[in-house]
């Protein structure tokens, strides 16, 4: 009969989607990171807002709930979003760009396997990229620090681009 958990949206639309400033910012980020649609950007923005909200709640919470801080900081450090010496106050400074930089699509592009984020997206969706020995077909996969060195490309075009970059 299905899962008994409550299904929630994984993104939040902007309050004023047709505001000029919001449109310019979303178009800039979507173009730079090669996102397919605005929903991908909203999903990453929702993640950043979620962790900022948790940080605000923990700052206001009594000392007896300080044990909740450590796992959240460790998770974001493993993803490479926070530095090793991060504190709870650093959670308040999270931005969408920090999450977009940790997507598999962006990392494949930055490593030089692809000439553009759009080419990186195509390589991933066609199954030419492996992370830690597993084929991953989601461009939005958030890459952990320990997995970053284990990204490999199985397509000959990756090798050509890699030679051009070096």
Swiss-Prot record:
GO terms for cellular component: small ribosomal subunit. GO terms for biological process: ribosomal small subunit biogenesis; translation. Keywords: Ribonucleoprotein, Ribosomal protein, RNA-binding, rRNA-binding. CDD domains: S4. It comes from the Archaea. Pfam families: S4. GO terms for molecular function: rRNA binding; structural constituent of ribosome. Residues 102-164 form the S4 RNA-binding domain. One of the primary rRNA binding proteins, it binds directly to 16S rRNA where it nucleates assembly of the body of the 30S subunit. Part of the 30S ribosomal subunit. Contacts protein S5. The interaction surface between S4 and S5 is involved in control of translational fidelity. Belongs to the universal ribosomal protein uS4 family. This is Small ribosomal subunit protein uS4. It comes from Korarchaeum cryptofilum (strain OPF8).
